[in-house]
Amino acid sequence: MQLFNLPLKVSFFLVLSYFSLLVSAASIPSSASVQLDSYNYDGSTFSGKIYVKNIAYSKKVTVIYADGSDNWNNNGNTIAASYSAPISGSNYEYWTFSASINGIKEFYIKYEVSGKTYYDNNNSANYQVSTSKPTTTTATATTTTAPSTSTTTPPSRSEPATFPTGNSTISSWIKKQEGISRFAMLRNINPPGSATGFIAASLSTAGPDYYYAWTRDAALTSNVIVYEYNTTLSGNKTILNVLKDYVTFSVKTQSTSTVCNCLGEPKFNPDASGYTGAWGRPQNDGPAERATTFILFADSYLTQTKDASYVTGTLKPAIFKDLDYVVNVWSNGCFDLWEEVNGVHFYTLMVMRKGLLLGADFAKRNGDSTRASTYSSTASTIANKISSFWVSSNNWIQVSQSVTGGVSKKGLDVSTLLAANLGSVDDGFFTPGSEKILATAVAVEDSFASLYPINKNLPSYLGNSIGRYPEDTYNGNGNSQGNSWFLAVTGYAELYYRAIKEWIGNGGVTVSSISLPFFKKFDSSATSGKKYTVGTSDFNNLAQNIALAADRFLSTVQLHAHNNGSLAEEFDRTTGLSTGARDLTWSHASLITASYAKAGAPAA
């Protein structure tokens, strides 16, 4: 067996090195996105140093202060911080500030990046300034997040120092499983005899044959690797080479002759040639997901290596090629992510919108104002279409519209929830913690709770097993009856963790008539209009109950995974035994992103 096209002994060493770097990365300054290190005010000069998490290349850090009369001047008293130096062995940078001011009483820090705003306001107390020697903060300083259109006053509350603890047993298990899943995921990349950068959906070649590179699966898998390259594995050359290999394979397939003669070709052979058999094509979510992954990689790569030539010469043309395609085809029918229904799909539109929004920012940074404008306006038009998928009479999101062929189904589908995890951009638009996603989560879960025998008489520590959609007949290697999918169950756990993170960033959450069925599951006293404010016992209890529910989904994954941590595509709806493709790459990638979300640090 080979890994990274190297003999087993060498590749095993590389994977072990990968794991050891993850352990050592725990010594980075803080999990906060922005945190004060130290400051000094001598009566005339105010200066300091700030830890800034390197989320993207383009960022802005500002110190906002009240003057000697404790007047904020409508938050007009500002000092711009500037980049100073990277912090070795971490994904943090030092930023510094210095200004001559006549007087200062208190201050806080604002960090703007990728459409989000983070704050360090010293747990809502702000930093109180005295004329003294330099003062250093402790690692307990925390960060709050806010929508990109932030207010002119500091946030009223700070994010708690700890994410809800959930189930400690599951916390221990998932860290172990995360390592197993990472190894399995990497094992499916560059298998022997394949073209450089080939990411197999599974190494299974019969019963079923999944030994192909699906554009979607490869992009979502690489997105996980990019996130780690940008955070816990910053600077890791092995992982960088894996990502560059993925780019090489992907760029080649962009120009490969295919049956659909378009970028929406779903899958490719191990030698990077197009699959020519009958299939549901095109699948237009793939180019959008690939562009998103390429953009995240471009930002991280440029920050870490300062090598602009690779970004402008290789990544930029590929990104623009994919997104130009999305602009031209987004309103056309195509096959869904399950490859079974031809129509217009909620999931596909969500990942398209995300790719275009990131692409607009990327184009602007790269001097292409025309594309930036086109991508932005198209994303806005797509958002209007996405909103039409909400069916108020059902209180859930319809999965598809304008269906012209394929499987007939009522419209409930777990992909609408995966779209929130994978296709939202932290702007409140169908995000995991938004009311319509929460309502749909209740409806989808309820549909499987009564359908699958495995969900009958569940012990209290388990969550419901979740499939793709209730009418599913694909059994993993043919047609009879659908089963639970590991990535659907971990997707539910991730959705819950992301929702909690979102509410913390927003200072709380208010129940609406739409989301009430969700909140009733975790607080019997919930009513429409009730607000759970961060820092209150009501919010803490709610967050902990939802985290425990997420952990019950992970307990279900733990129960049905193989003893060695292997995760197939599915597990049987009656017996609970694994079925379908062995060690599905997407199953393992989904487990890893759920683990990050459980730790309060969801992937981009």
UniProtKB/Swiss-Prot annotation:
**Which stretch is the leader sequence?**
1-25
> Where do the annotations place substrate binding?
279
Q: Does the keyword Glycoprotein apply?
A: yes
**What keyword terms does UniProt attach to this protein?**
Carbohydrate metabolism, Glycoprotein, Glycosidase, Hydrolase, Polysaccharide degradation, Signal
Q: Which GO terms describe its cellular component?
A: fungal-type vacuole
Catalytic residues of the enzyme: 336, 339
* Signal is among the record's keywords: yes
- Write down the EC number: 3.2.1.3
Entry-linked InterPro entries: 6-hairpin_glycosidase_sf, 6hp_glycosidase-like_sf, CBM21_dom, CBM21_dom_sf, GH15-like, Glucoamylase, Glucoamylase_active_site
| Reactions performed catalytically | Hydrolysis of terminal (1->4)-linked alpha-D-glucose residues successively from non-reducing ends of the chains with release of beta-D-glucose
- In terms of superkingdom, the source organism counts as Eukaryota
Ranges where the CBM21 domain occurs: 26-130
Extract the Gene3D superfamilies matched here.
Answer: 1.50.10.10, Carbohydrate binding type-21 domain
- Where does this protein have compositionally biased stretches of type Low complexity? 130-162
Map out region (Disordered) in residue numbers: 127-164
* Residue numbers spanned by region Adsorption to raw starch: 26-115
Which residue stretches belong to region Starch degradation? 116-604
What GO biological process term is on the record, naming one? polysaccharide catabolic process
* Glycosylation-annotated residues: 122, 167, 230, 236, 564
Give the molecular function GO annotations. Answer: glucan 1,4-alpha-glucosidase activity
- Write out the similarity annotation: Belongs to the glycosyl hydrolase 15 family.
* Other noteworthy facts: Rhizopus glucoamylase exists in multiple forms, Gluc 1, Gluc 2, and Gluc 3, all of which hydrolyze gelatinized starch at similar rates, but only the largest one (Gluc 1) is able to adsorb raw starch.
Identification of the protein by name: Glucoamylase 1
Q: Which organism is it from?
A: Rhizopus oryzae
